[in-house]
Amino acid sequence: MFRVLNKVFDTNQRDVQRIVKTVVQPVNALEEETMKIENLAEAFMRLRQRVQEGGESLDDVLVPAFALIREAGRRAIGKRHYDVQLIGGTALHQGRIAEMRTGEGKTLVATLALALNALEGKGAHLVTVNDYLARVGAEEMGLLYRTLGLSVGLITRDMQPHQRQAAYACDITYVTNSELGFDYLRDNMAQSREQLVLRADNPLHYAIVDEVDSILIDEARTPLIISGAAEKATDLYYVYAKLVKRLQRGEPAEPGKRTEPTGDYTIDEKGKQVHLTEQGIAKIERLLSLGDLYSPENMDKAHMITQAIRARELYHREKDYIVNAEGEVVIIDEFTGRSMPGRRYGEGLHQAIEAKEGVKIENENQTLATITYQNFFRLYDKFAGMTGTAKTEEKEFLDIYGSDVLVIPTNKPVIRQDADDLVYRTRMGKYQAVVEEVKQMHATGRPILIGTASIDTSEQLSALLKQAGIRHSVLNAKYEAQEASIIAQAGRSGTVTIATNMAGRGTDIMLGGNAEFILGEAIEQNFGISRFTPEAEAFIKAIGREDPEAVTLGLRIPGMTEQFIRQAQQLQKDIIADRERVRELGGLHIIGTERHESRRIDNQLRGRAGRQGDPGSSRFYVSFEDDLMRLFASDRVVAMMDRLGMDDTQPIEAKMVTGAIERAQARVEDRNFGIRKQLLEFDNVMSKQRDIIYAQRREVLLGTDEDVEESTEGMIADFTEMQLAFYAPIDQPAESWDLETLRTNMLEAVPQLEHYDFEALRHMAPEAAHAHLLEAVADAFDARKAELGPTMLNSLARYVLLQVVDQHWKEHLHGMDVLRQGIGLRGYGQRDPFTEYKFEATNMFNDMIDNLKADVTKFIFRMQFGQAS
């Protein structure tokens, strides 16, 4: 085992040394020369020209680019990138996951890879977990980017579409994972190019995901969903169920008997389809006072009426479905005869059957668009990630995202002391021990951070600390900006802070407090300007250096007084003094109140202490009533406590126990990874389908008129070939062809074929017959184009394609949801649920595409002039 571990560390070390040799040393060699460059923006733009016009790769210009970015950091924000930060920036550029300890300056490291990748002119995204961190990153690093001539955008929750367009058009954009994901989904529901907010040409080029383990592992299974209320149409299903009772079933046209179909609709039992006749269309329009049934505003109504007829004529109670005691329509498996609870017909058919039966129609939000973070970030041309804890999850990053983890060396050695766990019999015994430890530490003035796994635990501990008379702050990840403010000061002497695991993530805890943070907040509150303006930044930096020029710089800020400046100078002195005091006391002490299922989360909590070479310590308190211990701890440990006669207040402290806990965590991590990987396999089926639909939409939205016309003609030809394959198959004798149904179906879609002699097809060679009908349909399309004019036809085609694709995709998503939920209930015996899901999902998708092409054909040939406007 140790040999394997050594091999892992050797590989990491070799990679680091390679970057030192090929990047760090050459960048350092350029430093003196770069400091002499007066206009960094001009120099950086010359690199942009080399990449965009000269054909050089980003790797070709990496060294001079990093040298310029480092110098921009020094000049603009007073922060020069350390050598280890250059290593981190290189890893991010390479599309790797960079593991960097807390306090190592991830925000600054990201500027290297973001600015470098922005040279391609395709945009670079910094993705973080909340609006507050996105704003701080964009504003704090904005000066650096602007010094290089790069534009910086920020996306926040409350922005309007035009503001989002401007932000995404910038060279570098800071955005939260949820806003980015939802913008992507909304763009794929847009009805015109002008509605797109992401770049039209290459929306997802390069991204760095901050706190990458949180987004791509902890939130990996949480899908982003845009939904709309489906209940609006519920009453209409009942209306149409009554309407179709007033329609008459007819017979299709039949040579020698009828030249036209009779009745209001005809039935195709073989294909389980219904077809409205001209008489039926006119009757529906009259009964509903609709005008044209095939006008844009009536598209959904035409679809729902067709489904109501199918429900009435083709789906029968006790054969295709039952109505159970709860009044639910439950499908019967046609092969086994068993009911399939949880399964629903797609595309509105199930609701139509519910309306026919007079039972309650299921009210639910209709999914309009959805994607998981796992599949979303894999759409990027290249993405990287950074976090304090990633190595324990490297297998998952590699298997799912193809990204390895590079552990970046710390700038200064880590000297934090991590004690073995203390294990108690009961949870309350553990909490009492935590309070005693806090009392003792607090008496010395040492700052303490208590990490909890839940809000409930933090409130319990808070109540116990109040009883003990210990003042403290409680954080539970509800208020992002206030949270950062409190966590930034958690390193001051005498401070006790309770925080849930994720609270304040992304904000450093500095011993003695964070003077820059306090001063920045005071400037914003007192003078109404951002702490990131050049004037405020210069003043804050001068205070931090204890520079006498701080007085002159401060008085340049409108409204600032000498009294405020003196208070700022005193604050800096107090914090420096307090920092030394806290260091002498041993630094920040971390108390973990239980072990998390993931070692990574525990390591994140520990990593709060010991930043940048500071002293610090950590210890976890565990009880046998904790979930992890209850489910996974060895019975031997419990038995040992019993043998020793230990009571609730006596702990075990032994490496054996700590090791047992970590082995339990590794087992849980493996299990959770397996679950995520299995779910991803299911998601990948949907992902491939989504890629096809979104590519089709994008082609319609952004393509030329010629592209759209070609797509439309292709769909019409596909629909025609589909009908021919079904009713006049080449491999069957012509005498057996069902030309009557072929005629009915084709006339419903292409009424311009009313004079076409379908019976004549029987007397041609099969291939010639197919070609003849296809040519007739192509002629009908040309006639339609001549009738409407090319411009009007293309407007109509774009509109119809988008509307039809969106309607069918929305209904398909619902069907996929139902399939996913019901797949485990299907009694497949020894058959693999995933194989069955993939098979059924593929069939559903193919059916949807066929129906989509049929609807496009129908609307293109039937819609009246002016209705698409």
Curated annotation (Swiss-Prot):
It catalyses: ATP + H2O + cellular proteinSide 1 = ADP + phosphate + cellular proteinSide 2. InterPro entries: Helicase_ATP-bd, Helicase_C-like, P-loop_NTPase, SecA, SecA_CS, SecA_DEAD, SecA_motor_DEAD, SecA_preprotein_X-link_dom. PROSITE patterns: SECA (PS01312), SECA_MOTOR_DEAD (PS51196). It comes from the Bacteria. It is found in: Cell membrane; Cytoplasm. ATP binds at residues 85, 103-107, 508. Its EC number is 7.4.2.8. It holds the Pfam family SecA_DEAD. One of its GO terms (biological process) is protein transport by the Sec complex. GO terms for molecular function: ATP binding; protein-exporting ATPase activity. GO terms for cellular component: cell envelope Sec protein transport complex; cytosol; plasma membrane. Keywords: ATP-binding, Cell membrane, Cytoplasm, Membrane, Nucleotide-binding, Protein transport, Translocase, Translocation, Transport. It is a peripheral membrane protein. Part of the Sec protein translocase complex. Interacts with the SecYEG preprotein conducting channel. Has a central role in coupling the hydrolysis of ATP to the transfer of proteins into and across the cell membrane, serving as an ATP-driven molecular motor driving the stepwise translocation of polypeptide chains across the membrane. Monomer and homodimer. Part of the essential Sec protein translocation apparatus which comprises SecA, SecYEG and auxiliary proteins SecDF. Other proteins may also be involved. Belongs to the SecA family. This is Protein translocase subunit SecA.
